[in-house]
Amino acid sequence: AENEKIKIDFNLEQQKTNDLSKDKQALNEKITGAAVLKAYKITALAYKSKGVEKEKETDKAARTDKIKVCFTVSENKLVSSGYKRFFVRIARPDNVILTRGPAYTFQFLGQTLQFSAMETLNYEGDAADVCTYFEHPVNGAEMVKGKYFVNIFTEDREIGQTTFELK
């Protein structure tokens, strides 16, 4: 009888251990899912350079030679600290990606994508402001009139997007 009780107790404890393991795995999956960065307060503005260190905001495609993209990276204490690279892709209305050349690529979910600008941030878990520029190369794809799409990526995730219009 005592031997039977020990078997029952053992089976109950084994079931508790299995349940705890499942709970732990579910929590780890939730933490992993929550340990992501997000971008907010995203702005994209077109500029015309006016000499050294001077620029003027414009909404005209023909005058644009620089696009400034700014965003705030969310606070998230679950994300590991360290240097994070943020890739900005700017697509013209015809879906041509603005880039400075064929070497401007990054890996995203197993694909090689072109980027327009990249910025590195030493992320420490706190919200942080990031600004980066796409400077239009002399021989690059022309700026055209219409709606441009801006997407921001880091660590195999798209973390934000916005649009802007040039006339």
Go through the PLM ranges and name each one:
Residues 4-167:
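Membrane-proximal structural modules of membrane-associated proteins and complexes
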